[in-house]
């Protein structure tokens, strides 16, 4: 790809400025390709947030907006590289035997650029010629001199592919109309159909999927070929689902829940809460009727709060996994209610995979108790879990503004009492 020095100089000069302002004042003169420069400025700005390592390299070319939006973040790409390295080591390949990776759905090449570094040979396959041109330009700048770029259809390449160490795929999650699809059968290439051929070519196949998929069903669809399931989140937002396929038959795959530095792993058979995965929208939908008439004002005078010293809220990966039994067994926490997905304990837990709070006081919706609970409060962060009111309705009822250092959790306990817990957030890892 030929880009003039004037265009590169223009990009370097203006890349930290508002793209709209640059577009308004740019002079269409000389060798500067202004449309290309504007696209690159916007791409660099997105990369500086999502891919800081990439943004630190001068001369990279960024693709149009859609591939940039769909590509992995630096965190998730590095996670896959570490996973690939571990899987390679577990295969116990001869030290003298060269290792090889084939990425059949190369895209912008972010995952490939990190994963390929742990292999001796790496092949990037992409059917869009523009992305292949960008990859050929970018990979040498990123130090990937061992990378080979193939512009072809993934299934055509798979047909002629020899034996390799690992195959990686990120099936497209958009249909012909451009809308998102969330069933693996709707994704292309069709990994379910290609499963046997993929595993004939490589002993390990890693598949990246939408976090919106029902991972239990997806694992079942692969009929015992799934060795590991990785639910990867960052900033408490579930980003992707990774399946590791192997040549054996795996009744209980390893499930790994990762959220930034928090990692919890377990065997699928260890959790009896199967098929219970929860999203934020599902939690919100569990408000039973959204009316004050349904609120219980039963007094908490006889309330046994001996275990209610600390409150624990699982992170997004744990919620997606639905491994609530594992949490109770491993961390000695107690479910407030099976439908609330909040946990309490008598002791602080340093490594709980989620947020933790110190409970200051507890009240039912009894007016006298609420008044005592809210004493001195003008602001609070409010969350509802399995509660009849929305956050907005409860905030209005309690007459509190948003913000401050106090966190109120409104929920329902196992006896059906509607409770409000006044808490303070604890630092991660503190006791």
Specify the residue positions occupied by each region the protein language model found.
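SAM-dependent transferase fold signal centered on methyltransferase-like domains
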Residues: 1-431
